[in-house]
């Protein structure tokens, strides 16, 4: 599986997930500097946090 890995709206970077991590993840939240984005590979989809504005977990290449 290959997942996007950069903290920008448009993300050209991706990486192959290590063994045991078969989910692509994207989380967005608001800070005083504006919207923040986190993208990476995970083993389990995390819970929706109280400050999150969106949370995406998917299992296709570069789906996050």
UniProtKB/Swiss-Prot annotation:
GO MF, any single term: ion channel regulator activity
Disulfide bonds, paired cysteine numbers: 3-24, 6-11, 17-41, 45-57, 58-63
Major subcellular location class: secreted
InterPro entries, alphabetized: Snake_3FTx (IPR003571), Snake_toxin-like_sf (IPR045860), Toxin_cobra-type (IPR054131)
Disulfide bond in keyword set: yes
Pfam families in the cross-refs: Toxin_cobra-type
Tissue-by-tissue expression: Expressed by the venom gland.
GO CC, alphabetical: extracellular region
Subcellular location: Secreted
Key words, A-Z: Chloride channel impairing toxin, Disulfide bond, Ion channel impairing toxin, Neurotoxin, Secreted, Toxin
The keyword Disulfide bond is annotated on this UniProt entry: yes
Function description: Allosteric modulator of the GABA(A) receptor (GABR), possibly increasing receptor affinity for the agonist, thus enhancing receptor opening and macroscopic desensitization. In vivo, intracerebroventricular injection into mice results in periods of reduced basal activity, followed by bursts of intense seizures and death.
Note: Negative results: does not bind to nicotinic acetylcholine receptors (nAChR), muscarinic acetylcholine receptors (mAChR), acetylcholinesterase (AChE) or to receptors for glycine and glutamate.
Record family assignment: Belongs to the three-finger toxin family. Ancestral subfamily.
Protein name as catalogued: Micrurotoxin 1
